[in-house]
Amino acid sequence: MKEERPIIALDFSSFEETKAFLDLFPAEEKLYVKIGMELYYAQGPDIVRYIKSLGHNVFLDLKLHDIPNTVRAAMAVLKELDIDMATVHAAGGVEMLKAAREGLGQGPTLIAVTQLTSTSEDQMRGDQNIQTSLLESVLHYSKGAAKAQLDGAVCSAQEVEAIKAVTPTGFTCLTPGIRPKGSNIGDQKRVMTPNQARRIGSDYIVVGRPITQAKDPVAAYQAIKAEWAG
């Protein structure tokens, strides 16, 4: 099911920056935000509690990757924060993914990271020694996530159609690396515009710097939201 709001990546490290950014939006504007490693490691669980207290949805993107027992226990702790979505690395294997699902329970959305959108095929082959194509690797990880009863996968928009063809109905695709037309792609290798992601079937999109570093973040958010809605 398509999420109507683009998820805003809160690429900050301090509470003050985060609060100042969120304060730009009207109180009635309920956002869906992503808390990544930088902000969570700097501010801890309290930043999640604060954002939830404002009525926003939280995607906690920590990409857990450890032995199954450790991941199960960590997810059980994160569940207590009332998060709406979490991530694990698909490379941890099906047993680890199943453990993550057990720890988090059935309420929050749980998605698997396949290949990072900063990873090129040459990098994958050289650094990870995976000698298939990048798409084949993404599909392999996505099928493992579905087998473990996860809700979806993180992938580039170019991979969405292929993933949906090999996974059960309802398996969702979250697409980072979204950039409005004409913007700087930064360190992302595989990017699309909100309109392209919508047309190709992405269920969630994540947008960071084009909103958080815009001269008018609220206007930038509303423009991207409108493009995503079609």
Swiss-Prot record:
GO BP: 'de novo' pyrimidine nucleobase biosynthetic process; 'de novo' UMP biosynthetic process
Entry EC number(s): 4.1.1.23
Catalytic activity: orotidine 5'-phosphate + H(+) = UMP + CO2
The keyword Metal-binding is annotated on this UniProt entry: no
Binding-site list for substrate: 11, 34, 61-70, 117, 179, 188, 208-209
Subunit comment: Homodimer.
Function of the protein: Catalyzes the decarboxylation of orotidine 5'-monophosphate (OMP) to uridine 5'-monophosphate (UMP).
Protein name: Orotidine 5'-phosphate decarboxylase
